[in-house]
């Protein structure tokens, strides 16, 4: 398995994503936003940061980058796509995930570890976790308030698309939502950073199982 780690101007978690992929026992390579193909890759990781300086709004300018057309094709083919923080914002901007990310209720940038609950462990991103297991991931965002309409929330809930919730909502996210998947289950977006949760020495290794879940799921289907 080989992950593509997308890199936009202003990305600052691309190395963390790359490291997470390598640590999970597979290959990875950086892919510039100006590229137009993802041939040779089996999964896509869209990192956090401030793509294009967050001008217009978070993820808006990245949503029209050349590589995005290929990301959409990749997702349509059922291949795994993970977007974290700014990556989640990009996935909502391009319509691969519903809802939007707004300014935190506090209007402050939040940077700390948060305890979250795995609400669905039947996805390629979470199946090595136990349902309702508490995990600790760092958060680092100013626009992490997940918003959706009541109708979209009902759909997310009915389709079991909500995979991660805050136990102590730091940003005002609707119904404590921290991470979701698309209806097909192969596209995942979350505001917390599992790629920064790989080492107990640094505070938490809760993120290891997310990347190992992705790899195990892919191998079960392709090897």
Curated annotation (Swiss-Prot):
InterPro entries the record matches: Class_I_gatase-like, PRibForGlyAmidine_synth_PurQ
Pfam families, A to Z: GATase_5 (PF13507)
Entry's transmembrane regions: none
SMART domains, per database record: GATase_5
Coiled coil: none
Listed pathway(s): Purine metabolism; IMP biosynthesis via de novo pathway; 5-amino-1-(5-phospho-D-ribosyl)imidazole from N(2)-formyl-N(1)-(5-phospho-D-ribosyl)glycinamide: step 1/2
Biological process terms in GO annotation: 'de novo' IMP biosynthetic process
Superkingdom, taxonomy of origin: Bacteria
Enzyme Commission number(s): 6.3.5.3, 3.5.1.2
Described function: Part of the phosphoribosylformylglycinamidine synthase complex involved in the purines biosynthetic pathway. Catalyzes the ATP-dependent conversion of formylglycinamide ribonucleotide (FGAR) and glutamine to yield formylglycinamidine ribonucleotide (FGAM) and glutamate. The FGAM synthase complex is composed of three subunits. PurQ produces an ammonia molecule by converting glutamine to glutamate. PurL transfers the ammonia molecule to FGAR to form FGAM in an ATP-dependent manner.
Protein name per Swiss-Prot or TrEMBL: Phosphoribosylformylglycinamidine synthase subunit PurQ
Organism: Staphylococcus epidermidis (strain ATCC 35984 / DSM 28319 / BCRC 17069 / CCUG 31568 / BM 3577 / RP62A)
Underlying gene: purQ
């Amino acid at each position: 398995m080989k992950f593509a780690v997308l890199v936009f101007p202003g990305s600052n978690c691309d190395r963390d994503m790359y490291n997470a992929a390598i640590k999970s026992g597979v290959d990875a390579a950086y892919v510039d936003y100006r590229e137009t193909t993802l041939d040779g890759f089996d999964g896509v990781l869209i990192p956090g940061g401030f793509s294009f300086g967050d001008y217009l709004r978070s993820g808006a300018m990245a949503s029209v980058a050349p590589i995005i057309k290929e990301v959409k094709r990749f997702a349509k083919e059922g291949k795994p796509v993970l977007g974290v923080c700014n990556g989640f914002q990009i996935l909502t901007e391009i319509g691969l995930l519903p809802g939007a990310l707004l300014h935190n209720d506090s209007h402050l940038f939040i940077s700390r570890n948060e305890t979250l609950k795995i609400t669905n462990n039947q996805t390629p991103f979470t199946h090595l976790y136990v349902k309702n297991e508490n995990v600790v991931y760092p958060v680092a965002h100013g626009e992490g308030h997940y918003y959706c309409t009541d109708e979209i929330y009902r759909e997310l809930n009915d389709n079991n698309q909500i995979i991660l919730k805050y136990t102590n909502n730091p940003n005002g996210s609707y119904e404590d939502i921290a991470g979701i998947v698309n209806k097909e289950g192969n596209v995942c977006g979350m505001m917390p950073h599992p790629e920064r949760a790989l080492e107990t020495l640094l505070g938490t290794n809760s993120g290891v199982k997310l990347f190992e879940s992705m790899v195990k799921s892919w191998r079960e289907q392709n090897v």
